[in-house]
Amino acid sequence: MSGLTYEDVSGGVGLRVTVPVTMGPDGAARELAPRLSALAGERAPASPHGEPARATRAVPVVTIDGYSGSGKSTLAAALARLVNGWQVLHLDDWYPGWDGLEAGADIARRIAADLRAGRASSYEAWDWENGTTGATIPVPLAPTIIEGCGAIEAEADLVIWIADPGEDERRSRALARDGQTYAPHWQRWADQDLGRPVK
């Protein structure tokens, strides 16, 4: 029996799925993978010979969101192992610094809009060590998972929200993942993260 809950996203844009705290990333990925495969299949245009043609139009976009340390990256990695042909984009790669959650969400919205309109996209990578923008990274036209705090802001075919396991658990996971470099910024980031509207 599924532990996932489903609801229509306002405006009929897509479907929102909530992953409960009690469901691990591998179990959630196993349940979600067939839905992603179906989305990719629906968007693959057929050639005149009845074979799938190379995508030249809109591609599906799936977003994974949840508060910092909730398991977004882990779920994205688990899904990527189960579905072929999907690229995974991480908002961590383009947030412009520790105060950049809103700007990162804007970039996610733009990338999703480009891909859903059948256009390749790009973003400027953020150099966390030097606190500056880095290289421009191309985002090819391919089925895409966008994960990170603020990803829910982008219009998507499927929006995945990971339920909050509680601040202590999230902080523990985030610091285990990012080390002590994140520790002095935890509250600063949490204020943005918890203060944002979650649709």
Language model feature labels by segment:
Residues 4, 179-199:
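Small-molecule kinase domains that catalyze NTP-dependent phosphoryl transfer to phosphate-bearing small molecules
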